[in-house]
Amino acid sequence: MMLLIDSGNSRLKLGWLRSGAREPEPAAFDNLDLQALASWLQTLRPRPTRAIGVNVAGQARGEAIAAILAQCGCSIEWMRPRREVLGMTNAYRNQAQLGADRWAAMLGLRMRLPEGHPPALLASFGTATTLDTLGPDNEFAGGLILPGPTMMRGALVHGTANLPLAEGPVTLYPTETHEAIATGIAAAQAGALARQWLAGQERYGQPPEVYVAGGGWTEVRPEIERLLQLVGAPFGVAPVPVILQTPVLDGLAALASAL
């Protein structure tokens, strides 16, 4: 059994690969609660001896995870972005700057697409929102990073004197502060996604397929679906986002299968 570990800014997501089969349901814990990881490891049969993962939560967090795994007799290899792997090339100028989770997620997306696929835009709504594009030639073209919905909301609370920690409906013309904040956050997320969708249409001459992931998707879904209908209409398409549950773990599983 090979463990698959996605150590994100807020959440620790875990899966496994055994004889080509995946976990029936991934595990997820607060990334500060490493005791939950230790307890989960005790439930696994057979006990894993190897793990691969990506870590964007800092060196100390990676070392702490490795130490817990070592107590169970399991070693881990933290994966780093490569210029080319499993048929996917990487246009990032400096590989060391690219978040390993973004790279693994794009690889997970790549492995589910047929040859000759349209451009694909993957939007991940987590602590940060990332909007990354895979071309028909299987090149990761690059993408955007911006604060996720929760971080945007917190920034308004901590960076201003009077704005509340707001939740509310999204409307075209908000007339109440909670609505104004909720709508502004959704509009920022949707606008960034629409920009990258249009950039893909411009670069590749065909409309990108849209894939989404992350815990923030539910909050921004209505505004994104509405805006995608508007930007797609001039091209005769109505993009419908496809939800991916674990694109990072999917990419790690592909790498593990190739080891």
Curated annotation (Swiss-Prot):
Main location: cytoplasm
Pathway note: Cofactor biosynthesis; coenzyme A biosynthesis; CoA from (R)-pantothenate: step 1/5
Active site feature: 101 (proton acceptor)
Cell compartment(s), UniProt: Cytoplasm
Superkingdom of the organism of origin: Bacteria
UniProt xrefs under Gene3D superfamilies: 3.30.420.40
Swiss-Prot/TrEMBL GO biological process terms: coenzyme A biosynthetic process
Reaction catalyzed: (R)-pantothenate + ATP = (R)-4'-phosphopantothenate + ADP + H(+)
Classification via InterPro entries: ATPase_NBD, Type_III_PanK
Record-stated family: Belongs to the type III pantothenate kinase family.
Subunit structure: Homodimer.
Name of the featured protein: Type III pantothenate kinase
Organism name: Bordetella avium (strain 197N)
Record gene name: coaX
